[in-house]
């Protein structure tokens, strides 16, 4: 059992009451939001899934028996509780790396190495390197490569075959691993985030019940005090075609704005919240491991490795620009959402093949799953999510525990 799994259960208060935000001198801000159709591939689904005699929630038996990777199937334990995540310093492994990539692209592997740009500015596809063979120095260079390219797709990997314990330990090289507030994880591996879209026509139809698109652009758990750095994701089972993942570059999006707008945006801060995600889980009969959190982050953050500015807003978890009135905030946020989501010339489409691992820089890119297959085929994937630094608008605040404006409390 991992250290995180062994933490003492902590009783947490209900959060079904309205949220009041206290912002260290800023006005109290009240807000409401609806979050699309919910996370049906990460949350327990009452009526589809099962409850064991011990109270453990799990995927139904008929799906478990057909799984090619049963060790990665999600479970949800209603007794598993954690306190709030605490601040910790983060030292990006990319800052330790050899910029010549002499370990990652070792001379002895050059003959079998195939590297292809996915787009001129964003993304690489690599064949001929096994992630499981990398030394610690090569992993540092991997972090640097992902920061520089935004998204790196590795083909023909044995990564998932090594099992949940191995991939969890692998992820720890890149930072303290995040434990999700509601999603399923393999038993005894709480740091793995599992997505499992069930092969059920009704569930597929639910995606489009209230929307004309399956798109759900976001950056992972931006509501946390210290959101992730390098996200590792692998689809272990899925459709033969479709189910791709879209990525958009928020550095490029920021660079395309006019200088006056760039300067104005760089003075603003945004509320990010997990409240709606937790409510979605509970509506579906699922769990809540921690009390929902709300944090304020700069609208424009500086990437600690690239020293470049990124737009740090996303439709899933951003709620309001602190300094603006509600209507002003909604108009500006929608403009920025649409800029990132609709500018296809700053995006790429990662196609899933068996034994692929995609690694992306969660600070730089947004992503969205594409649900476009029609047959009732399940899509099963796992994610490793190392936490990064607290987002800052100036690197002089990097790893400063007293940096404001992220700190706030929930009056619940």
From Swiss-Prot:
SUPFAM superfamilies: Clavaminate synthase-like (SSF51197)
Pfam families xrefs: TauD (PF02668)
Keyword Oxidoreductase: yes
InterPro entries: AtsK-like, TauD-like_sf, TauD/TfdA-like
Residue ranges crossing the lipid bilayer per the database entry: none
Function: Acts as an alpha-ketoglutarate-dependent dioxygenase active on sulfonates. Although taurine is a poor substrate, a variety of other sulfonates are utilized, with the best natural substrates being isethionate and taurocholate.
PANTHER family associated with the record: ALPHA-KETOGLUTARATE-DEPENDENT SULFONATE DIOXYGENASE
Residue sites binding 2-oxoglutarate per the record: 245, 352, 379, 383
UniProt organism field: Saccharomyces cerevisiae (strain ATCC 204508 / S288c) (Baker's yeast)
Residues binding Fe cation, per UniProt: 218, 220, 367
One Gene Ontology MF term: metal ion binding
Modified residues (Phosphoserine): 52
This enzyme's EC code(s): 1.14.11.-
Pathway where it operates: Organosulfur degradation; alkanesulfonate degradation
Gene (UniProt): JLP1
UniProt KW keywords: Dioxygenase, Iron, Metal-binding, Oxidoreductase, Phosphoprotein
Entry note: cofactor: Binds 1 Fe(2+) ion per subunit.
Top EC group: oxidoreductase
One GO CC term, this protein: cytoplasm
Taxonomy of the source species: Eukaryota, Fungi, Dikarya, Ascomycota, Saccharomycotina
Family (UniProt): Belongs to the TfdA dioxygenase family.
Listed cofactors: Fe(2+)
Protein name in the entry: Alpha-ketoglutarate-dependent sulfonate dioxygenase
């Amino acid at each position: 059992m991992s250290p995180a799994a062994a933490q003492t259960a902590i009783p947490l208060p209900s959060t079904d009451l309205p949220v009041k935000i206290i912002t260290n001198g800023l006005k109290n801000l009240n807000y409401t939001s609806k979050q699309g159709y919910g996370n049906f591939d990460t949350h327990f689904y009452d009526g589809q899934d099962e409850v064991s005699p011990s109270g453990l929630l799990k995927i139904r038996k008929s799906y478990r028996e057909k799984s090619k990777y049963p060790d990665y199937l999600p479970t949800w334990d209603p007794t598993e509780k954690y306190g709030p995540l605490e601040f910790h310093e983060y030292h990006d492994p990319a800052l330790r790396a050899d910029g010549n990539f002499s370990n990652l692209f070792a001379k002895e592997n050059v003959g079998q190495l195939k590297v292809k740009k996915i787009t001129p500015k964003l993304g690489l596809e690599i064949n001929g390197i096994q992630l499981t063979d990398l030394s610690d120095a090569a992993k540092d260079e991997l972090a640097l490569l992902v920061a520089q390219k935004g998204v790196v797709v590795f083909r023909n990997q044995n990564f998932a075959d090594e099992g949940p314990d191995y991939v969890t330990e692998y992820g720890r090289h890149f930072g303290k691993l995040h434990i999700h507030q509601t999603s399923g994880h393999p038993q005894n591996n709480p740091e793995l985030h599992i997505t499992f879209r069930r092969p059920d026509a009704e569930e597929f139809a639910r995606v489009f019940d209230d929307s004309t698109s399956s798109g759900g652009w976001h950056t992972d758990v931006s509501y946390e005090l210290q959101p992730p750095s390098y996200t590792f994701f692998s689809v272990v089972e899925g459709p033969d075609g479709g189910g791709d993942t879209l990525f958009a570059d928020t550095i490029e999006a920021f660079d395309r704005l006019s200088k006056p707008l760039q300067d104005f945006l760089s003075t603003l801060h945004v509320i990010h919240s997990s409240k709606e995600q937790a409510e979605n889980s509970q509506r579906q009969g699922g769990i809540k491991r921690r009390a929902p959190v709300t944090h304020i982050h700069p609208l424009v953050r500086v990437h600690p490795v690239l020293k470049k500015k990124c737009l740090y807003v996303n439709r899933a978890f951003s709620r309001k620009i602190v300094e603006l009135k509600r209507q002003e905030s909604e108009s500006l946020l929608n403009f920025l959402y649409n800029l990132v989501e609709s500018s296809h010339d700053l995006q790429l489409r990662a196609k899933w093949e068996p034994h692929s691992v995609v690694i992306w820089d969660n600070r730089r890119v947004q992503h969205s799953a594409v649900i476009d297959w029609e047959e009732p085929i399940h899509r099963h994937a796992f994610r490793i999510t190392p936490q990064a630094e607290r987002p800052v608008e100036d690197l002089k605040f990097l790893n400063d525990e007293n940096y404001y404006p992220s700190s706030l409390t929930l009056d619940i």
